[in-house]
Amino acid sequence: MATLLHIDSAVFPQGSASREVTSTFVKTWLEEHPEGKVVYRDLAANPLPHLDFAAVSAGAQNTLRAELADELAAADAVLIGAPMYNFTIPSTLKAWLDQVIIVGHNAGSPDGPVASIPFTVVASRGGSYAPGTPRADFEFVQNYMEKVLGGMFGASVDFIVPELTLAPSKPEMAELVPLAEASRSKAFEDAVQKAKDLAARLAA
């Protein structure tokens, strides 16, 4: 029985693009893998504390950090909803990363205990920060998540990127609505296909 660790971090419980896409991913994964298990953390509803001196000093001996590290190590795959807030990830997701990354325990080595776990990140954003766009240099979600998960854990990271999510609600972005709708449709298609691919991979 495979385990999927599902993490959401969007502050909006309803109407969140990242939550809608991660939900579609999980639904498809369970349909393809009915014996699978999903462990869910909603970091907006139940935020973790930021690291303090005691937690850093204790490392894996800290109760919370050990719990989070064990939860991650027990997963066969990880799904993370990471909407862009102020050009980067939500602070609640950063707190989870800071707590769960323990150098010398599960991080800092390319062949550590998390290296074989595939990560899928739903990186939604209100505008477009794709290569070649005017604000490409402001993209600190995909860049950061790829570097931190790949660099600290040695893990592979796959992305689903719903862009221009604010276009339908912003009159000044009206001309971008068709692009937003296309991006949204592709994100759901990607979620379904990647969930199916992951389920097949874990069942092999």
Where are the regions a protein language model picked out?
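N-terminal beta1-alpha1-beta2 submodule of the flavodoxin-like/Rossmannoid cofactor-binding fold
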Residues: 1-82, 87-102, 178, 188-204
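Active-site donor-binding loop signature of nucleotide-sugar glycosyltransferases
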Residues: 43, 124, 162-164
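A contiguous catalytic/ligand-binding core that recognizes phosphate-bearing ligands
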Residues: 104-108
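Glycine-rich phosphate/pyrophosphate-binding loop and the adjoining helix
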Residues: 135-139, 144-204
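A short, flexible beta-alpha/helix-coil linker loop
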Residues: 10-12, 126-129, 165-167
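Residues at the starts of beta-strands that form the adenosine-phosphate
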Residues: 3, 37, 117-118, 156-157
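Short, glycine-/small-residue-rich phosphate/pyrophosphate-handling segment
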Residues: 109-154
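Structural beta-sheet core signal
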Residues: 6, 80, 119-123, 159
